[in-house]
Amino acid sequence: MSEVGKRNPACPIDRIGLKTTGMVRYNFGAAALYEEAIRRGEARLTAHGALVAETGQHTGRSPKDKFVVRDAATEPEVWWDNNKAISPAQFETLFADFLAHAANKDLYVQDLVGGADAELKLPTRVITEFAWHSLFIRNLLIRPDKAELGQFVPEMTIIDLPSFRADPARHGSRTETVIAVDLTRQIVLIGGTSYAGEMKKSVFTMLNYILPQKGVMPMHCSANEGPAGDAAVFFGLSGTGKTTLSADPSRTLIGDDEHGWGPHGIFNFEGGCYAKTIKLSAEAEPEIFATTQRFGTVLENVVLDADGVPDFNDGRLTENTRCAYPLDFIPNASKTGRASHPKNIIMLTADAFGVMPPIARLTPAQAMYHFLSGYTAKVAGTEKGVTEPEATFSTCFGAPFMPRHPSEYGNLLRELIASHGADCWLVNTGWTGGAYGTGKRMPIKATRALLTAALDGSLKTGEFRTDANFGFEVPVAVPGVDSAILDPRSTWADKPAYDRQAARLVGMFAVNFEKFEPHVDATVMGAAPRMQEAAE
């Protein structure tokens, strides 16, 4: 086995049984990986120096093809209602077949770290078949320095082989695509997909399993910090404004997607960003756009014109076009990836029913309720002429990546909020003056003004009213914001229609929360929206 690159000589890849007749390249940097990816025909150079690759059939994650090993250790710990199981024997067969498949391949190895807190970090070795995947994960995770590489011992190992094809009869998979996670041995096998995001989310899944045992809250959120050291976290599902609202030139960006909240404060799990690029423009998001114009960034499924210039408006391959770049490509990004305990927790929703206020203050119990609910609303495809919004509930704002029961994460969050006195806010970036199709989108200027008032502490000193439907507190007046939008009912021309819509949404919350009722206490149940008042 031929091996090149900086590494710990006492820790080769054959320690997990992986041997190959090909070349193993350890910890190559961007320039060398560019050369490899282009030489092998995996990727192309853009006119501005970024690397662009296509993922073929899989242009997003394959959640239905993800499996967790059900063994004696994970049996009582994993939320099996939400995680598909494979047996240890099936995993062993799959693992052996992965090793056999890799036995004649050139491989790329990156020794990286998940978690910017030195006491809680997860040293992770990522072994890939593609050079561009190696650069992708090098951009996304935290890179040790040369001295640390010489001593590096991985705790987690990912083997990523897009050319592998799983056999459902032999491996217990659903299709030829498989993401198999052994939480006990901390091994992840990814086969039959070239979508690079699977690697990133595998590390997130592992940290989501490990950290709660240490009293640390893993969070699917963005985070930033003000000049006075006041940190804020932003929970939110796709399309709610998580990336946009946390990108604030007056605040330091800690990270855009995955964080932990531990004894020393919050910390980024990653060292990079994986941003959506569909319809990306220099005017709307200048910092993200600038990263796509430089050497080192990986573009995924982005179409190039004849001159090699990315066309971010072209979604012919997928609407889920992406760019992956190191965090230090963003001018106001944190150099440490760490911040103090958050002073403010923001839960974002895009309520297309037009019922929720633009901002509301939550008690710790209400925060747990809304965290477990993970509500937003999707707008139906206008091409079908359907204008009815569709409620979406993704518990913990990230159900696909949570191996444990949601109540574990919810209780942890509630305890941390209470012990550190964080203020919690629900921010609605959805519709006002009516539902989708009748009302209009909440003005971003108003959302930013409300957010600024929440983060600088001025909002909580003002006057609040209690919302009749949801029971949370809503500000009555905020400087620079039209007071009318603070009371959603007043913005509707048809008040009885608002009441019916509110009752309907409250009912959806209640039905969704039924599965959590056995796992929460009376205080959290008391924080639920009030069906009777809403229906009156």
Swiss-Prot record:
Keywords: ATP-binding, Cytoplasm, Decarboxylase, Gluconeogenesis, Lyase, Manganese, Metal-binding, Nucleotide-binding. Its cofactor is Mn(2+). The keyword Acetylation does not apply. One of its GO terms (biological process) is gluconeogenesis. It is found in: Cytoplasm. It catalyses: oxaloacetate + ATP = phosphoenolpyruvate + ADP + CO2. The keyword Transferase does not apply. One of its GO terms (cellular component) is cytosol. Signal peptide: none annotated. Pathway: Carbohydrate biosynthesis; gluconeogenesis. It comes from the Bacteria. Its EC number is 4.1.1.49. GO terms for molecular function: ATP binding; metal ion binding; phosphoenolpyruvate carboxykinase (ATP) activity. ATP binds at residues 201, 220, 236-244, 285, 322, 447. InterPro entries: PEP_carboxykinase_ATP, PEP_carboxykinase_C, PEP_carboxykinase_N, PEPCK_ATP_CS. Its main location: cytoplasm. Coiled coil: none annotated. Involved in the gluconeogenesis. Catalyzes the conversion of oxaloacetate (OAA) to phosphoenolpyruvate (PEP) through direct phosphoryl transfer between the nucleoside triphosphate and OAA. Belongs to the phosphoenolpyruvate carboxykinase (ATP) family. This is Phosphoenolpyruvate carboxykinase (ATP).
